Each structure stands twice: as structure tokens, then as C-alpha cells.
Swiss-Prot record:
Chain's role: This is one of the proteins that bind and probably mediate the attachment of the 5S RNA into the large ribosomal subunit, where it forms part of the central protuberance.
Similarity-based family: Belongs to the universal ribosomal protein uL18 family.
Gene field: rplR
GO BP: translation
Keywords of the record: Ribonucleoprotein, Ribosomal protein, RNA-binding, rRNA-binding
PANTHER family assigned: 39S RIBOSOMAL PROTEIN L18, MITOCHONDRIAL (PTHR12899), LARGE RIBOSOMAL SUBUNIT PROTEIN UL18M (PTHR12899:SF3)
Domain of life: Bacteria
Protein name: Large ribosomal subunit protein uL18
Annotated source species: Acinetobacter baumannii (strain AB0057)
Record-level Gene Ontology MF annotations: 5S rRNA binding; structural constituent of ribosome
Gene Ontology CC annotation, any one: cytosolic large ribosomal subunit
Assembly information from the UniProt record: Part of the 50S ribosomal subunit; part of the 5S rRNA/L5/L18/L25 subcomplex. Contacts the 5S and 23S rRNAs.
Family matches, as Pfam families: Ribosomal_L18p
Amino acid sequence: MNEKKQSRLRRAKSTRLHIRALGATRLCVNRTPRHIYAQVISADGGKVLAQASTLDASLRSGTTGNIEAATKVGALIAERAKAAGVTKVAFDRSGFKYHGRIKALADAAREGGLEF
């Protein structure tokens, strides 16, 4: 595994340990060059309460690897999380920089009503 990926995974592990210590429900984000995924995971880490990604039928028709798509995923995850009864989450960016698509998803989720 290359050094850049190892550093990202180390940051992700550290963040997840901190969130687990808080006992908070987390909004976990993962990105690939082509897609972006978001899950709301329960505080114990055992259950996915809501999920959204660019693979969803409603979002798949457009482009999937850009900031516009990440914004749509953020709005969709906020809507689904609220439907599941979740309003407060800890943002788990999986070690990715808070920039670009990750930032766009987080901003859209906040506008959709999720509290970080």
C-alpha cells in the first residue's frame, strides 16, 4: 500500500476512535474517482440507519464524480437521516481532506437539516 493511502487510513482510524469515544451517530463518507457514498451509522457501529450514493437510481442519470453530484448526495442523506429520526451526527470524512466533494456533501447535509 502506498504511503498516501496509509496516511489517510491512519487519519480515518484516529477519527473513528474519537467518534466512538463520544458515543455519537456518525455520517461516514467515502469517495472514489467515479462515485461518492454516505452512510449514517448508529453510535455502537452495528447498524446503518440511512445511506445514499451516486449509485442510487435517482442520482445515477447525471454525472457522478463531481461536486454537483456530491451536493445531491448530501441533500439526499440528510433527508433519509431525518426520516430515520437522526438529526445530530458526527462527520467522519474517512481521512479525506475537507475540501471539494467532501466539503460539498457536508455543506448540503447541513443545509438539509443535519447538525454536526
